[in-house]
A protein has these predicted regions:
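Juxtamembrane intracellular "pre-TM" segments in multi-pass secondary transporters
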Residues: 2-15, 203-230, 413
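Helix-loop boundary and gating motifs at the non-cytosolic
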Residues: 2-65, 226-231, 236-253
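Helix-to-loop junctions at the C-terminal end of transmembrane segments
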Residues: 68-83, 274-287
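A membrane-interface helix-boundary motif in multi-pass transporters
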Residues: 86, 172-189, 368-392
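Structural signature of the two symmetry-related core transmembrane helices
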Residues: 86-103, 289-303
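Intracellular juxtamembrane helix-capping segments at the cytosolic ends
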Residues: 131-144, 327-341
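Glycine-rich segments within core transmembrane alpha-helices of 12-TM secondary carriers
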Residues: 150-172, 353-364
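A late C-terminal transmembrane helix in Major Facilitator Superfamily
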Residues: 343-374
């Protein structure tokens, strides 16, 4: 084996370690959010908050994420030129976030008099936890070679997909258990994982796989970026409506409620499997093209789920829909890093996560308004995912076809 081949192998190993770390971080963070969502109704009741108001607390969380995800991404871009500073920034905010998170069940246990403190802790937790979304992923664009980014994005999103797959089982496992121990365990694991980011950042800075990028010369995000983010809002809304509102009723046409914990993860199995082969296509053709094709494929899969005549057909359609969403999210991360390649990686990634949060807020608003229970809105909710994924997918394909030719020094979007 020659020196060049050995260097490539070592570089790929280092890159894979970074991707695995980010996957673990996303897994632990998402499972912590799931734990919070499972216990929130119980904790809210202890401080005198009515069950009907819990959805509004969750909407508040998403509204905060919509703002702070972008803000944290911008902050990451400004901090990143000083090696090690980003890890310290994320670590410090994670300490605050975990402290607020651990305190929630203990404060709730003191009764209705602690209601204001309970809400305050939730707000603090939501604001500070945004530091764990876009900023760590921005390291991929700052230190990793462009051809490796799609695969590393797939690795990072694997943590998110695994968390989605195990969430139904986590809900069953935590049923009727005291909230304090799960909150403490998830916070400790998340804190340990997040504090390792500084070490990862310094290691990447010592062994960069691409030349240092000029900082402070970031071009303003133009029309293409705005269209990309708008498309992400639409795609994310399609996912929210399909998976969170429509998937369970689809399954209940052929299965019993007790079977849902085994059927719902089918979507996430497809999600996790499809990202890696799709990352090869993104490497050669760019994220926007894969994002658009995945949107159209997902729309066809939702149509298949809508018209499925038996459980096996529905399972296959849900599997394909999960594949499509996995390809969308992986290629969106890759495209965001390419768009922000000259020092705005965190900002564009933050906008992507803000788009996801905004779509989640919209879905929760629909639930809070009871739209899924109104017969006149049922067709809208059923067909909205098809419309969202097909329209956004087609628009992204058009955008990709009209992109300007790239020079050899610029990443493929």
């Amino acid at each position: 084996m020659g020196t060049t081949e050995l260097s490539i192998d070592v570089g790929m190993t280092d890159a894979n370690r970074t991707g695995v770390y980010l996957a673990i971080l996303q897994l632990v963070f998402t499972l912590g959010w799931t734990t919070y969502a499972i216990y929130l109704p119980e904790l809210a009741a202890k401080v005198g908050i009515a069950p009907s108001a819990v959805i509004f607390i969750l909407m508040l969380d998403q509204a905060i994420f919509t703002v702070t995800d972008t803000a944290m991404g911008i902050a990451a871009d400004r901090i990143a030129p000083i090696v090690g500073r980003l890890g310290v920034f994320v670590g410090a905010l994670t300490v605050i976030s975990c402290a607020a998170f651990v305190a929630l069940p203990f404060v709730a246990g003191t009764g209705p008099g602690a209601q204001h403190w309970f809400i305050t802790l939730i707000v603090i937790w939501a604001i500070t936890s945004s530091a764990l979304r876009a900023p760590p992923l921005s390291l991929l664009g700052k230190y990793r070679a462009q051809p490796s980014i799609p695969f590393l994005s797939a690795l990072a999103m694997l943590g998110y997909g695994l968390a989605g797959a195990v969430s139904p089982y986590l809900g069953v496992a935590l049923r009727n258990r005291d909230a304090r121990l799960p909150f403490v365990i998830s916070s400790v694991v998340l804190l340990i994982t997040a504090l390792a980011l500084s070490r990862v950042e310094r290691y990447l800075a010592r062994k960069p796989s691409q030349p240092a990028k000029p900082r402070g010369v970031t071009e303003p995000l133009g029309r293409k970026s705005a269209i990309f983010i708008a498309a992400m809002v639409i795609l994310a809304l399609g996912y929210q409506l399909h998976f969170s509102l429509n998937s369970a009723p689809f399954y209940l046409r052929f299965a019993k409620p007790a079977d849902l914990e085994w059927l719902m993860p089918v979507f996430w199995i497809g999600f996790n499997i499809a990202m890696f082969p799709a990352s090869v296509v993104v490497k050669h053709r760019g994220g926007l093209i894969v994002l658009g094709i995945a949107g159209l494929l997902g729309a066809l899969a939702v149509l298949g789920a809508e018209f499925a005549g038996n459980l096996n057909t529905l399972i296959a359609a849900q599997f394909v829909a999960g594949m499509a969403w996995g390809c969308m999210l992986m290629s969106a991360i890759s495209a965001a890093l390419a768009i922000g390649h000259a020092g705005a990686e965190g900002k564009v990634l933050g906008l992507v996560f803000s788009a996801l949060a905004l779509a989640t807020f919209a879905r929760m608003a629909a639930v809070a308004g009871g739209l899924q229970k109104l017969p006149e809105y049922a067709p809208l909710l059923h067909w909205a995912p098809v419309a969202c994924w097909s329209v956004a997918g087609a628009g992204l394909l058009v955008l990709a076809s009209f992109r300007l030719p790239q020079s050899g020094r610029l990443p493929r979007v």
